[in-house]
UniProtKB/Swiss-Prot annotation:
The modification 3-methylthioaspartic acid is found at D89. Belongs to the universal ribosomal protein uS12 family. Part of the 30S ribosomal subunit. Contacts proteins S8 and S17. May interact with IF1 in the 30S initiation complex. GO terms for biological process: translation. The gene is rpsL. Gene3D superfamilies: Nucleic acid-binding proteins. PANTHER family: 30S RIBOSOMAL PROTEIN S12 FAMILY MEMBER. This is Small ribosomal subunit protein uS12.
Length: 126
């Protein structure tokens, strides 16, 4: 326990909270242009071909972001919306691309969790 004199000489240091998604700069989402769309493999216990895109954001950052859902229509120069949220088994992927917004279409034939994948409600068969 420091004395009051010691605290006057050197105050307690404030805890610095580091952002988990610095490229967003405290915005909920950011717009960007795809510079490369490709697949990559996850870390050790898992095995797959995960779809990711390298995106140049409007604020100049270049980030790798994940494309969720089955199938996508992204190519180079597609304009996309980025949100925060990392992918645990892909190192360096700290952002997700928002489905159903700007150039990225929603997931086709999606019945559950539609809002997360930008899918419209299916028409009732009468």
């Amino acid at each position: 326990m420091p004395t009051i004199n010691q605290l006057i000489r050197k105050p307690r240091s404030r805890l610095i909270v580091k952002s988990k998604s610095p490229a967003l700069e405290n915005s909920p989402q950011r717009r960007g242009v795809c510079t490369r769309v490709y697949t990559t493999t996850p870390k050790k216990p898992n095995s797959a071909l995960r779809k990711v895109a390298k995106v140049r954001l409007t604020n100049g950052f270049e980030v790798i972001s994940y494309i969720g859902g089955e199938g996508h229509n992204l190519q180079e120069h597609s304009v996309v919306l980025i949100r925060g949220g990392r992918v645990k088994d892909l190192p360096g992927v700290r952002y997700h691309i928002v489905r159903g917004s700007l150039d990225l279409q929603g997931v086709k034939d999606r019945k559950q969790s539609r809002s997360k994948y930008g899918a419209k409600r299916a028409k009732k068969a009468a």
